[in-house]
Amino acid sequence: MRLQFPEGFLLGVSSASAQIEGGEVGSNWNDWYHQGRIKDDSDPAVADDHWNRWREDCALMAGLHLPIARMGVEWARIMPARGEIDETAIAHYRAELEYMRQLGIRPLLTIHHFSNPMWFERLGGFSKRENLDDFLSFAKLCADRFGDLVSDWITINEPNVYATNGYFFGDWPPGHKSFSETLTVLENMAFCHIRCYQMLHATREAMGYSDTMVGFANHLRVFEPENPKNPMQAATARAVEWLFQGAITQAMSTGVFRLPLKNHWKLPKGEYCDFHGVNYYTRSTVTGFADGVRKNSPRNDLGWEIYPDGLPQVAAKLEKLLKRPIWVTENGTCDNQDAFRARYIYEHLHAMLRSGLPFERYYHWCFCDNFEWLEGESARFGLINVDYATQTRTIKRSGEFYADMIRNDGVTDEAYNTYVRGEVYRVE
């Protein structure tokens, strides 16, 4: 055996409703497309048409022998107007969740994954404290309607990416460029997570369940100075890491708000995650307050460095913050020809499992090629190829490798030689 998985270790896949479902649902990403802001002009109303093909996609998951899968629900579908509930949408999601369970797939449900209804966006979204009850009402509705089918929950996906891209750099909706507003959004999302954590446990406990697991998925990367001997660059790297991921991770995990975040609600210190959710993709080199990529490093098709050792590095910091099991809630790569994805997956799993850290789950991003936010459909991360003209699904070579790992509870020598050996990264 080339790589043996520890007992109980699970492999799964991740997806997000706005990236796969399709449909003109009145979300901020539908609006962003109509403003002409998607690089390849892909329309999220098309995406993978998962809303109409969910049975086919769930059957594909079962065909890969997946025991777990992460999915989301689209707020704009469930609440198309403020205070309005679409019971048809709720019934649709319940049917999908029930079918997953029938197939032996345990769902991990994400409540918020970058997508807002436009009515919420027009009110100021998460930048306005008076709007937070709207999100908390949606979260409570999810708990009430799906709590009997879902034990594992992610409250908010990548609050740091949502806030910085939408409110600091202005590349994502709503397109603002304000440091103070970015901090406000982060503070408000931390508040929402803590309230959701408490609510989800209370709601499911009232239903008679004691197996609730709640966390959040944060985007974590390694920040290193371009020149390790340069003290200014080293200090800047530490500052960027804290501003981008350290402060928000601590606030949401423990209720401890430290600069630049403030605890305006006087929330009590506590423990507000049952697992550490890690979304890891790359390492960034730092000279100033902008990302860089180390020279002569392996890169994916978006130019991101491929750095497997960074995954246990970021996870180790979470372990020091709070002793919890670690779930890799996203890890994957843009590989449009599926030329090195199997190697990428193998090397990240190898780095994780040799670390000795309490990794319990690995959710590959993503299940099938999808609408990859600003990049559109041109950036392919999936184990399943999607022909967007016909919506035909085809299992990629990397998907076959993934299924083989699940069947064998690890990577056999034969699988390594068949799928991993010979795959080569592009180096720049």
Describe the residue ranges of each PLM region:
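Non-catalytic scaffold segments within catalytic domains of secreted glycoside hydrolases
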Residues: M1-W54, C58, A62-P67, A76-E428
